[in-house]
């Protein structure tokens, strides 16, 4: 068993790259506000968290705070679960490394997101960043640090998704840039050089591989004590008629 940092990304359907934030994949936002699927997932996540009482970090997109339905739900969740912390998943869900380098644009977005999320989350806020959809290039590292963040958890160090690592497609270059910028890096867990987090939890074979990796995880700790980091999507809790849960040794 290995100490692990549990994290959850709160993207709604309107945030996925096929809807927004990618120069070639996005086809337009399908809906505004909290989707029906997200509402169902939120209810199931509430039930799961009330039962397990685990400590985890939620990486929130700052524009979600503008949605009163989501904001009220998250505020209530944080009040009931003081063990939950909040990190930044961007101002919007823009996949920055898929676009030409724009340090000024990224800095402005990160500062605005930091202020917005910090004011909302209060004591639960942490200066931790996760790039939308895991798109992070080396040029982004010093900007993330300049915006006041201390830890980054964007790297998915698998060859299968190296296109997200900027023009060099090199995760080692991203990791080196994070280190040189003074940022603590917490990459996501891989097994057999394959992803085990996020979408990998529901893709055939990758899901089998992920379950094999996750069953060896625990206890659940903060990122500075963790040997591994995993994440899943809040939307996942709407799967299997609301009965889905992460493949952790909790029961």
What does each model-identified segment do?
Residues 1-79, 234-235, 242-250:
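Active-site beta->alpha N-cap acidic-glycine motif
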Residues 3-7, 55-59, 83-87, 126-128, ...:
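Structural preference for beta-strand elements that scaffold enzyme active sites
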Residues 13-18, 95-96, 195:
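Short acidic/His/Gly/Ser-rich catalytic and metal-binding motifs that mark active-site loops
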Residues 28-33, 61, 125-127, 199-205:
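Surface-exposed cleft-lining segments at the edges of enzyme active sites
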Residues 32-40, 104-108, 205-208:
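Conserved phosphate-coordination/catalytic loops
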Residues 38-48, 109-117, 140, 213, ...:
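Alpha-helical packing segments of well-folded alpha/beta enzyme cores
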Residues 54-137, 161:
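Metal-dependent polysaccharide deacetylase catalytic core of the NodB/CE4 family, i.e.
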Residues 123, 130-238, 242-246:
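Active-site-adjacent pocket scaffolds in enzyme catalytic domains
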């Amino acid at each position: 068993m290995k100490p692990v940092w549990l994290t959850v990304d709160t993207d709604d359907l309107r945030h996925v790259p096929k809807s927004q934030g990618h120069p070639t994949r996005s086809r337009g936002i399908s809906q505004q506000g909290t989707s029906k699927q997200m509402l169902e997932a939120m209810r199931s996540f509430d039930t799961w968290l009330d039962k397990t009482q685990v400590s985890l970090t939620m990486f929130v997109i700052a524009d979600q705070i503008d949605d009163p339905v989501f904001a009220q739900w998250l505020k209530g969740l944080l009040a009931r679960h003081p063990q939950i912390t909040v990190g930044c998943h961007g101002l919007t869900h823009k996949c920055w490394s898929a676009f030409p380098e724009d340090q000024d644009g990224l800095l402005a977005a990160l500062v605005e997101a930091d202020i917005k999320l910090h004011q909302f989350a209060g004591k639960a806020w942490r200066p931790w960043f996760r790039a939308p959809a895991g798109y992070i290039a080396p040029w982004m590292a010093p900007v993330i640090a300049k915006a006041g963040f201390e830890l980054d958890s964007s790297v998915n160090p698998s060859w299968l998704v190296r296109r997200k690592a900027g023009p060099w497609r090199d995760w080692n270059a991203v990791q080196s840039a994070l280190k040189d910028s003074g940022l603590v890096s917490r990459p996501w867990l891989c097994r057999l050089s394959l992803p085990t987090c996020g979408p990998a939890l529901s893709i055939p074979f990758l899901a089998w591989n992920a379950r094999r990796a996750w069953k060896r995880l625990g206890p659940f700790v903060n990122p500075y004590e963790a040997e591994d980091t995993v994440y899943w999507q809040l939307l996942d809790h709407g799967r299997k008629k609301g009965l889905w849960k992460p493949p952790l040794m909790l029961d």
